[in-house]
C-alpha cells in the first residue's frame, strides 16, 4: 500500500477541481449521520485502510486524543515516542484534557520504538 500522509492539512493544498467539488458538495447534519459527503468520506477512508468503519474529525490533534482516550482513562499512562506529534506538539492534550500521563521513549530514524524499551516501560497494576 502507498504511504498516506495524514500529518496535517497545512502540508497540502486543494486543487481547483477539489475546490469546485467542495462548492457543490451535498451537506447535512453530520452529528445525526445525515451528511452524505461526510458519510461517503468515512466509507471511502474505511475501504482504503481495510477497516470496518472510519470517523471524520476536524483535526489530527482531535483524532490523536480520540485514539488515546479510547484506550486509556484518567490516571493511566500512555507509552509514546519522544518525537511523536501527540507528545511534542499538541499542547499536552493527553494530560490536560484526558488526564493521561505520557511516558516518552526514544524512537529511531523511522519513528519506531524498540520493543525492549516498550516492554521495560510497561508498569504493572499499582494498588496505591
Regions found by a protein language model. Give the residues of each.
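Binding-interface segments
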Residues: 63
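Glycine-rich loop at the start of a catalytic domain that most often binds anionic cofactors/ligands
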Residues: 67-75, 93
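Alpha/beta catalytic barrel-like cores
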Residues: 67, 81-82
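Conserved N-terminal alpha-helix of the aminotransferase class I/II PLP-enzyme fold
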Residues: 14-60, 82-83, 87-88, 93
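PLP-dependent aminotransferase-class I/II
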Residues: 99-128
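Structural motif
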Residues: 4, 53-56, 76-78, 101-103
